[in-house]
């Protein structure tokens, strides 16, 4: 099924991939992205662990409806979370792209 040394090579590749993924996860945790709503009037900065680092609100919104401002903050946070998820997927895909796996084989991590 795996050929001579195939299983050993596969295990070695899995170990290397796991190390790369650990490093990538550490890098992702350090990333920061900015989500926006209201055409940039509300900005939320989060890190790769989805922790909110900063919320910026344009002063013109402070005079408006409280409910609208709350909605804009939530929308900006959701935009930032979506951006972090996209970045994580791109970075993780780059880690696993070089690995030669048998058809149908799925990694546990």
Swiss-Prot record:
Superkingdom field: Bacteria
Gene3D superfamilies noted in UniProt: Nucleoid-associated protein YbaB-like domain (3.30.1310.10)
Residue ranges, annotated region (Disordered): 88-109
Transmembrane segments: none
InterPro entries in the cross-refs: YbaB-like_sf, YbaB/EbfC
Predominant location category: cytoplasm
One Gene Ontology cellular component annotation held by this UniProt entry: bacterial nucleoid
Location of this chain's protein in the cell: Cytoplasm, Nucleoid
Keyword Oxidoreductase belongs to the record: no
Record keywords: Cytoplasm, DNA-binding
MF GO annotations: DNA binding
Keyword Cytoplasm in record: yes
Protein family: Belongs to the YbaB/EbfC family.
Function as written in the Swiss-Prot or TrEMBL entry: Binds to DNA and alters its conformation. May be involved in regulation of gene expression, nucleoid organization and DNA protection.
Subunit description: Homodimer.
Protein name: Nucleoid-associated protein YbaB
Gene from which the chain derives: ybaB
